[in-house]
Amino acid sequence: MELHILEHRVRVLSIARPGLWLYTHPLIKLLFLPCRSRCKFFSLTETPEDYTLMVDEEGFKELPPSEFLQVAEATWLVMNVSHSGSVVQAAGVTKIARSVIAPLAEHHVSVLMLSTYQTDFILVREQDLSVVIHTLAQEFQIYREVGGEPVPVTGDDSSNGFPQIQHGPSPTVHPIQSPQNRFCVLTLDPETLPAVATTLIDVLFYSHSVPKEAASGGPESTSIPFFAFSLIEGYISIVMDAEIQRKFPSDLLLTSSSGELWRMVRIGGQPLGFDECGIVAQIAGPLAAVDISAYYISTFNFDHALVPEDEIGCVIDILQRRQESQASKDP
């Protein structure tokens, strides 16, 4: 397998809902006129709490500072995995759970995930790159993009001075909830983006028909507002509620031949922050063990896994049993 470290240097931001009006113009520019901003990595995710943005440095320049904008301190580098051969595996984050997510958690590297229709992006802090290379060099051929060209990276230069894995206290097992929404994962030909622009602007900025209550209480919670749009290196990916999809022209949105619907597992009872390690691993690992596909989208406050609709009961059971098992071990 190959691990590619892409050229994007990404910032992670949160726009408070009351301040969205201040950012409507720059967001529309990034959504529909990327050539004017030279932004190559743009992701916008609406959650009950806020709007999370992941943008490269060119996109970041478009966003004025304000009291409504929070910016995570770190600059994040973007990686993805290329699988050689045609072995059919579970989709999404599940297929990299053992090879990438678990080893990085063991070496105390905090990761963010952004699954799209096309691929899964792994974001790591720029300052952690040497640890990432050292950790994954035996498992992967690692390449770093320089000027658009992949340049081989070896772990030899970073192999000294790294201690053995220190097994500290078990990571916090965060509570989970499952909103009632049914989601679809879609793509769109960028050339047809203008044809859905009006609907997309309405859904993102003006239409909030889904209840705004955060997923709180029991594991089965009410529906929540959640909409994820990414435009990365010319490829579009959209995650939306199946009810919202009906607002769009059906002939322009593309999905897999099965037309599979997905349910959400929302991770975190309170904002997760960016320093804790192993959050993705505690979800991806158990699902990989039973070969259940999962898309995974990290946001500024909480994490979100999308699993096949017919597997949601099994997934909730697996993750709750893990919670109970961990709780029984804690003093």
Swiss-Prot record:
L-arginine binds at residues 110-111, 273, 279-280, 299-303. The modification Phosphoserine is found at residue 14. Phosphorylation at Ser-14 by AKT1, promoting the interaction between CASTOR1 and RNF167. It comes from the Eukaryota. Keywords: Cytoplasm, Phosphoprotein, Ubl conjugation. GO terms for cellular component: cytosol; GATOR2 complex. GO terms for molecular function: arginine binding; identical protein binding; molecular sensor activity; protein sequestering activity. InterPro entries: ACT-like_dom_sf, CASTOR1_ACT-like, CASTOR1_N, CASTOR_ACT_dom, CASTOR_fam, CASTOR_mTORC1. GO terms for biological process: cellular response to amino acid starvation; cellular response to L-arginine; negative regulation of TORC1 signaling; positive regulation of TORC1 signaling. Forms homodimers and heterodimers with CASTOR2. Interacts with the GATOR2 complex which is composed of MIOS, SEC13, SEH1L, WDR24 and WDR59; the interaction is negatively regulated by arginine. Interacts with TM4SF5; the interaction is positively regulated by leucine and is negatively regulated by arginine. This is Cytosolic arginine sensor for mTORC1 subunit 1. It comes from Mus musculus (Mouse). The gene is Castor1.
